[in-house]
Swiss-Prot record:
This is Mannitol-1-phosphate 5-dehydrogenase. Belongs to the mannitol dehydrogenase family. One of its GO terms (biological process) is mannitol catabolic process. It is an enzyme of class 1 (oxidoreductase). Keywords: NAD, Oxidoreductase. NAD(+) binds at residues 3-14. GO terms for molecular function: mannitol-1-phosphate 5-dehydrogenase activity. Its EC number is 1.1.1.17.
Length: 385
């Protein structure tokens, strides 16, 4: 079996690509990074360092190669022979690669390849593959769309593994460090043909419960740790979560978002409390030097209507649940400043150009004046400190 994976960065190599290769699948990495692709083509293997309380080992991932995304014809040619396509490029890049994927599918159809092909976007976004499908279909003819509906599975997934950037090592340019924990859950109802046997890929027919569990817990908690840590001058996530005041606030925020999950999906409260504790422990992993600016980057996206801060807040409003810690986290996200992050710069400009209430409504798309005013009050309190 052969897979084409878009994105040869840390997550691509350290998470999805590793699971595929470990399952005996030949992996072709597609990326614009010339150096990484040349290294993959030459070495056909790379090291992954796995770190945790019980583990600190380097494993070799083999049976891999690379193709340069700048040479679109080479990418398109891959579509005639692969059995699986995956991505780990970031939500903002999905739209960019959709035209290439559409051309690849067209080439596959023209070549007479009628075997089922499944595409899985492994991104930090809700229903990322469905978003990708909509963009891919915008480039296909009606006839190609009909053929794609019959042969191409667009499979939504939820992914969870902390993969921070590591200092470049000239002796091991492909080395990536990952935490021991990983979770990859796919919607089994969306596959075409036989579901591939991939170790570490879990199947479910209730994906949204797991998507929101991860978004409302791991992502919400991670963002909270970063934004509160930034305000107190911490550089790393571990330093932030080791701060007792921040740890207490992060836990309380995840408990508020967790109450929404328990109400919406019937999660067991004790099991979810244990899940929160596991995540707090992951944030404190001493082997992961994860910068708060990496975790807090792109604040406008993280403050958007369906993302990790506003969506759980909306859930508390829907079910009449407590939300004071979520409001404090949102205020701290609004206070995030980083001159090297274009979205952080734009965020600061938006808050200066308009009244705070109007800016918060524009950024979050929240319409309830009462909750917007509470966010504004919390933000103003932060500015005075």
């Amino acid at each position: 079996m052969k897979a084409l994976h878009f994105g040869a960065g840390n997550i691509g190599r350290g998470f999805i690509g590793k699971l595929l290769a470990d399952s005996g699948i030949q992996v072709i990495f597609a990326d614009v990074n010339d150096h990484v692709i040349e290294q993959l083509k030459t070495q056909r293997a790379y090291p992954v360092k796995i770190v945790g309380d019980r583990l600190n080992v380097i494993e070799t991932v083999s049976n891999v190669t690379g193709v340069n995304s700048k040479n679109e014809a080479d990418i398109i040619a891959c579509f005639t022979e692969v059995d699986l396509v995956t991505t780990a490029v970031g939500p903002n890049v999905l739209k960019i690669i959709s035209s290439t994927i559409a051309k690849g599918l067209s080439a596959r159809f023209r070549a007479g390849n009628t075997r089922p092909l499944n595409i899985i976007a492994c991104e930090n976004m809700v229903r990322g593959t469905s978003f990708l499908k909509d963009n891919v279909f915008s480039y296909l003819t009606p006839e190609e769309q009909q053929q794609a509906e019959a042969q191409i599975g667009f499979v939504d997934s939820a992914v969870d593994r902390i993969v921070p950037p590591v200092q470049f090592d000239p002796a091991n340019p492909l080395l990536v460090t990952v935490e021991e924990f990983s979770e990859w859950i796919v919607d089994k109802t969306q596959f075409k043909g036989t579901i591939p046997a991939i170790t570490g890929m879990e199947q479910t027919d209730n994906l949204m419960a797991f998507v929101e569990r991860k978004l409302f817990t791991l992502n919400t908690g991670h963002a909270t740790t970063a934004y509160l840590g930034k305000l107190k001058g911490h550089q790393f996530v571990k330093d932030s979560i080791d701060d007792p005041d921040i740890r207490e606030a992060v836990k309380a925020t995840m408990q508020e978002s967790g109450a929404v999950l328990i109400k919406r999906y019937g999660f067991d409260p004790h099991a979810h409390a244990a899940y929160i504790e596991k995540i707090l422990k992951r944030f404190a992993n001493p082997y992961l030097q994860d910068d708060v600016d990496r975790v807090g980057r792109e604040p406008l996206r993280k403050l958007s209507y369906n993302d990790r801060l506003i969506k759980p807040l909306r859930g508390t409003l829907e079910y009449g649940l407590p939300n004071q810690h979520l409001i404090q986290t949102i205020a701290s996200a609004l206070a995030y400043r980083n001159e090297s992050d274009p979205q952080a710069v734009e965020l600061a400009q938006l808050l200066q150009q308009d009244t705070l209430e109007s800016a918060v409504k524009k950024i979050t798309e929240l319409t309830e004046s009462n909750i917007v005013q509470q966010i504004v009050t919390a933000y103003n309190a932060l500015q005075k400190n």
